[in-house]
Amino acid sequence: MADIIARLREDGIQKRVIQEGRGALPDFQDGTKATFHYRTLCSDEEGAVLDDSRVRGKPMELIIGKKFKLPVWETIVRTMREGEIAQFCCDXKHVVLYPLVAKSLRNIAAGKDPLEGQRHCCGIAQMHXHSSLGHADLDALQQNPQPLIFDIEMLKVENPGTYQQDPWAMTDEEKAKAVPVIHQEGNRLYREGHVKEAAAKYYDAIACLKNLQMKEQPGSPDWIQLDQQITPLLLNYCQCKLVAEEYYEVLDHCSSILNKYDDNVKAYFKRGKAHAAVWNAQQAQDDFAKVLQLDPAMAPVVSRELRALEARIRQKDEEDKARFRGIFSH
């Protein structure tokens, strides 16, 4: 350990072990997944906390060898064992890009696009003093770089092949191979009643395919082939959202499918159910009529949905009449 700390010091990184880890130091070959909590502090007298993964409720997952935009994190986690807690003070040369990385991580934590605001700017332009990152603390750090302190707790180290990668960490080939596996896992979770988890799997599979599709010319044979793989996954995702009663999301996704494939029976049926749930009676009836036109064998199922819709409408009418009687009786 002493020689590791000495090498880090020569490179402008001071390491202080707070709690020893378990077992031997992993070899951290390319593809190893390191899961850790981090806290980032300024190194000035105030020592302000910039970011804390515990506050956000989700640890950082770093894949070794994937050229993460902040190479110093890969350097320091390579020196840690599972269960270890350590503090690293890193010279400014190692953390110049931290403001950009932190913005992306904050966007991810907030459920936003991690590339928001970065698509049309090169790295140099982003570092210009007049380019705001949308966070006052990151803007200040960008304009006046300083050494940063990282408190790291290494939670878990997983060797390549022992975990399922997140879509963003996969190569194109890995994404293509992963989609059928993720799809089947989503189906299994749905059958077992784990609807929210199934939706997350379908979402991941769609994300893989969308990423591949972005690299193809829209309307080209490869683009169409990928789109036809996306459609059944999106319909499965919509089924999960129907169960979760998130009807407007179902309306949006099914409409997007029908704008491209106007003979998709499942999209009409799911959209009809969503319309019925939000009291769009005429639109629901129109969609169910289209289902019967395209697939007469669906008649028993459609009839059941229409009867349920009519019963709900009658009940609502009776409730409205009772409410109005109450208003006018005073």
From Swiss-Prot:
Q: What does this protein do?
A: May play a positive role in AHR-mediated (aromatic hydrocarbon receptor) signaling, possibly by influencing its receptivity for ligand and/or its nuclear targeting.
Q: Which SUPFAM superfamilies match?
A: FKBP-like (SSF54534), TPR-like (SSF48452)
Organism annotation: Bos taurus (Bovine)
One Pfam family in the UniProt entry:
PPIase_AIP
> Where are this protein's TPR repeats?
179-212, 231-264, 265-298
A biological process (GO) of this protein is: xenobiotic metabolic process
This protein's GO cellular component annotations are: cytoplasm
Q: Please state what the protein is called.
A: AH receptor-interacting protein
- Record domain PPIase FKBP-type: where: 54-146
List-wise, which residues carry Phosphoserine? Answer: 43
Report keywords, A-Z.
Cytoplasm, Phosphoprotein, Repeat, TPR repeat
Q: Which GO terms describe its molecular function?
A: peptidyl-prolyl cis-trans isomerase activity; transcription coregulator activity
Q: Which domain of life is it from?
A: Eukaryota
The subunit field of the Swiss-Prot or TrEMBL record says: Interacts with RET in the pituitary gland; this interaction prevents the formation of the AIP-survivin complex.
UniProt-annotated location(s): Cytoplasm
